[in-house]
Amino acid sequence: SVGAYNSALQSYADFSGRGFTRSFQEIKPDLVAPGVNIQSTKSGGGYGAFTGTSFATPFVTGAAALMMEWGIIRGNDPFLYGEKVKSYLIKAARHLPGYEVWPNPQLGWGTLCLRDSLP
């Protein structure tokens, strides 16, 4: 799952879902992406700033698509999909300052970092 953080302030977005799963064996979200004041197109034309996990998730989706292009289309790893993509994204997640325990219930494994996700 994807949570949101404020990339300008390098802080957790308080509206973002957080916590342990019902079994208390997993922490969610898995990682976070920018989700505060994201510039996007507005209905009716023009641009606006939007906030929410609905604006954080496309960052992770785009990162996964680029990884799959690199692996599958360009022939670097023909089996780069699903859990393997998730594993690489989590492994490369960056930690925000001020948090001592990783993963944690606010930020999961950390913030999205596509650059460090590829092997």
What is the meaning of each model-derived region?
Residues G19, G75, G108-G110:
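Glycine-centered flexibility motif
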Residues E100-P119:
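C-terminal domain-closing interface element
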Residues S1-A65, D116:
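Extracellular S/T/G-rich loop segment that most often corresponds to the catalytic His/Ser-adjacent loop
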Residues G35-W102:
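Hydrolase catalytic cores
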